[in-house]
Amino acid sequence: MPLIDLPDFAGDLIAEFAARRTDRVDTPIIQPAEPFLDMAGEDLRRRIFLTESETGASLCLRPEFTIPVCLQHIETATGTPKRYSYLGEIFRQRREGGQEFYQAGIEDLGDRDIASADARAVGDAIAILNRLVPGKALSVTLGDQAVFEAVVQALGLPSGWQKRLIHAFGNMMQLETLLARLASPQPVTGLDPHALDFLTRGDEQGLVMHIDSTMQATGYSTNASRSPLEIARRLREKLVLSETRLDDEAFRVLEEFLSLSVPLADASSALAGFADAAGLKLGTALERFDARVAALANAGVDAGSIDYRAAFGRPLDYYTGLVFEVTMEGSAAVLVGGGRFDRLLTLLGAKDHIPAVGFALWLDRIETARAA
């Protein structure tokens, strides 16, 4: 489909992609909805335009490019490493601006040198913006979900709580709500007394049989809902989560970590100092963080011009490590956002593990920034 009403800087953008030896790729506007609903995160899920095929398959208008580019890579069985670029329309329900707008970006798939690929993504994003909005002061913010995951794991929380906190990473309001619940647990209410008795005695088989008989008596079909075993295990997890309390020292450590905000050039020493003071072993996560900072320096990116915020994340569930955003100084409008998504291609059906990192440029916001 020919692209119309492109911004006047589109030619410069395409030239930048070509100079970085990317393969230009296009994907269908109509996409299967399931991958986005499963993997994209709540913020994007509620903005998707959904529809159905005549056979009842759930479809959507393309809400972003990362998942479609990855699906196309898997379907064409293309080898890696591979660098893709894209430029096209995406469709989202938004309170401000149009519902359809242009997005462009680069997806870097299969490079095993994680630090180098991360540095290239950040460096390319900054360099492209410097060409598109020349003379404008940029603000770059970087976070690392893998470091947050390492901190949560080192604190020894139950796996259910770890998953909840990691899922909320980047959403401070949601994180603060979860931390408040960890500080002051609330008992589970409304449970069937018989189910509660099985749970407190740890009798999973008895609980499953009780749930099964209840479902049969009330006409619930296991084909249309969760199985008795699934329900039993979710109830057990819910009870464990409700009884878990984060002690005062662990709570203080987690809050101290989330409050870290320093220039990236100082971040490695700040994180090492935090880990030593808290007695936490963050191992590989810190090693990868340090390697990325070094790779950024080797790529000529000034780490002193980038802010590291330990609590910073992006509202997409598929990120696994590096996350970053670029704005104009003094503005909250994100011009570029990106990060690492090492698990995504496997979840989408790739036979082999494919590390990946990329970023997207918001062309309508860049157009506004150019006019400012």
Swiss-Prot record:
Recorded superkingdom: Bacteria
InterPro entries given in the database record: aa-tRNA-synth_II/BPL/LPL (IPR045864), HisRS-like_core (IPR041715), HisRS/HisZ (IPR004516), HisZ (IPR004517)
UniProt keywords, alphabetically: Amino-acid biosynthesis, Cytoplasm, Histidine biosynthesis
Pfam families in UniProt: tRNA-synt_His (PF13393)
Q: Which cysteine residues pair off into disulfide bonds?
A: none
| Signal sequence coordinates | none
Query: Known SUPFAM superfamilies for this protein?
Result: Class II aaRS and biotin synthetases (SSF55681)
GO cellular component annotations of the record: cytoplasm
Q: Where in the cell is it found?
A: Cytoplasm
Q: What pathway or pathways are given for this protein in its record?
A: Amino-acid biosynthesis; L-histidine biosynthesis; L-histidine from 5-phospho-alpha-D-ribose 1-diphosphate: step 1/9
Q: What other remark does the UniProt record contain for this protein?
A: This function is generally fulfilled by the C-terminal part of HisG, which is missing in some bacteria such as this one.
Regarding protein family, the annotation reads: Belongs to the class-II aminoacyl-tRNA synthetase family. HisZ subfamily.
Question: What is the annotated role of this protein in its UniProt record?
Answer: Required for the first step of histidine biosynthesis. May allow the feedback regulation of ATP phosphoribosyltransferase activity by histidine.
Q: What is this protein called?
A: ATP phosphoribosyltransferase regulatory subunit
According to its UniProt entry, this protein's organism is Rhizobium rhizogenes (strain K84 / ATCC BAA-868)
Q: What is the lineage of its organism?
A: Bacteria, Pseudomonadati, Pseudomonadota, Alphaproteobacteria, Hyphomicrobiales
> What's the encoding gene here?
hisZ
